[in-house]
């Protein structure tokens, strides 16, 4: 029974899904201070600090993606992010989190060399998001 539960959990993490409709309707950063109102939503979140060490500001890469696919991101300053349940997994800003019905599916790790290119290359970032999320709500 435990193996079945683990299999189902892993399948859900790997299966592609749609964001909630409201995140496909525009291409903006939606600033929030807490996640209570969207606790069960499916969305993409950008958490950031006061300093970005990347040569190209990663927010520019993310905004370009949002403009191209007409997708909005939740945006939360890292000081507020520390009070969320996701802080146990995402310890360093900046990061992008993919959330499915309130559960963390994937995130970019600013400390992981394998993720650095996704912060700096719009195609790499798009390919990463596309592994988890349908980019068009009509797909």
Stretches found by the model and what they are:
Residues 54-56, 83-86, 106-108:
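Extracytoplasmic/secreted cell-surface and envelope-processing proteins
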Residues 35-37, 85-89:
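Short amphipathic alpha-helix with an adjacent loop that forms part of the alpha/beta core around
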Residues 98-139:
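Non-catalytic, surface beta->alpha helical segment in thiol-disulfide oxidoreductase systems
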Residues 28-68:
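Local sequence-structure signature of Cys/Sec-based thiol-disulfide redox active-site neighborhoods
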Residues 1-23:
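N-terminal targeting signals for export/organelle localization
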Residues 87-100:
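Structural micro-motif
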Residues 47-49, 66, 70-84:
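Thiol-based oxidoreductase modules, predominantly thioredoxin-like and allied folds used
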Residues 17-34, 80:
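Short extracytoplasmic/periplasmic juxtamembrane "stem" segments immediately C-terminal to an N-terminal membrane anchor
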């Amino acid at each position: 029974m435990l193996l079945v539960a683990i299999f189902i959990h892993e399948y859900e993490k790997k299966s592609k899904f749609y964001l909630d409709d409201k995140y496909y309707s525009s291409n903006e950063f939606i600033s929030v201070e807490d996640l209570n109102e969207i606790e069960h939503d499916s969305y993409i979140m950008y958490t950031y600090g006061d300093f970005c060490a990347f040569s190209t500001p990663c927010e520019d890469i993310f905004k370009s993606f949002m403009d191209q696919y007409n997708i909005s991101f939740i945006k939360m300053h890292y000081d507020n992010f520390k009070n969320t349940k996701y802080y146990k997994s995402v310890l360093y800003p900046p990061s992008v989190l993919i959330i499915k019905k309130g559960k963390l599916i994937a995130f970019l790790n600013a400390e992981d060399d394998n993720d650095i290119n996704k912060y700096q290359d719009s195609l790499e970032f798009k390919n990463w998001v596309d592994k988890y999320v349908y980019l068009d709500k009509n797909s």
